[in-house]
């Protein structure tokens, strides 16, 4: 069974379309109007082995917030839809990923209980205009709309680009693990009988 989904969202502020294939090879076509965000989403797809298409336009002349948050909403909805009833998935995933001097941890439970813990130090903003707070808004929207509990922690890092990149890579690798199918799991991985 092909685990893929396409979701669109249009508001007065943004227009977003996402297609995701969970069992992909990491191919990506990303266009958000925000170069650094494009880079983060591209490496998210590559390191998670998701085939991902994101087309987004928004009021980035105001700021990046609306576009980044809405991409998180639509990506979360897309992954949630692609997971279906979540039968047979490993459900849990984790990764520790370095990027030069930065080290990020990500732990995921695809529990249908949305929650974000984001323990990432504030770092002076880089020239990209895409800071740690914006990354937090993306992951909050993503976690809530995917129905996942997501814990993110950065132990250390000085360069904001490296910190944010290590986070995106860690989440991608953890999500790849959590969405992976396991032949030993015949239904939802829960004593309740559902996730």
Swiss-Prot record:
MF terms (GO), sorted A to Z: imidazoleglycerol-phosphate dehydratase activity
Catalytic activity: D-erythro-1-(imidazol-4-yl)glycerol 3-phosphate = 3-(imidazol-4-yl)-2-oxopropyl phosphate + H2O
SUPFAM superfamilies: Ribosomal protein S5 domain 2-like
Enzyme class: lyase
Keywords linked to the UniProt accession: Amino-acid biosynthesis, Cytoplasm, Histidine biosynthesis, Lyase
GO biological process: L-histidine biosynthetic process
Name of the protein in its database record: Imidazoleglycerol-phosphate dehydratase
């Amino acid at each position: 069974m092909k685990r893929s989904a396409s979701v669109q969202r249009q508001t007065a502020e943004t227009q977003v379309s996402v297609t995701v294939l969970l069992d992909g090879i990491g191919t990506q076509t990303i266009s958000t109007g925000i170069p650094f965000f494009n880079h983060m989403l591209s490496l998210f797809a590559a390191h998670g082995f998701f085939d991902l298409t994101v087309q987004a336009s928004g009021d980035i002349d105001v700021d990046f917030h609306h576009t980044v948050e809405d991409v998180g909403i639509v990506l979360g909805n897309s992954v949630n839809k692609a997971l279906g009833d979540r039968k047979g998935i490993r459900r849990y995933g984790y990764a520790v990923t370095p990027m030069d001097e930065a080290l990020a941890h990500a732990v995921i439970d695809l529990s249908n209980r949305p929650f974000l813990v984001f323990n990432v130090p504030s770092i002076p903003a880089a020239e990209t205009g895409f800071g740690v707070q914006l990354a937090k808004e993306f992951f909050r929207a993503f976690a809530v709309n995917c129905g996942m509990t997501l814990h993110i922690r950065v132990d250390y890092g000085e360069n904001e680009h490296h910190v944010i990149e290590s986070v995106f890579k860690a989440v991608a690798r953890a999500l790849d693990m959590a969405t992976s199918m396991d032949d030993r799991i015949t239904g939802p991985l829960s004593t309740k009988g559902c996730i």
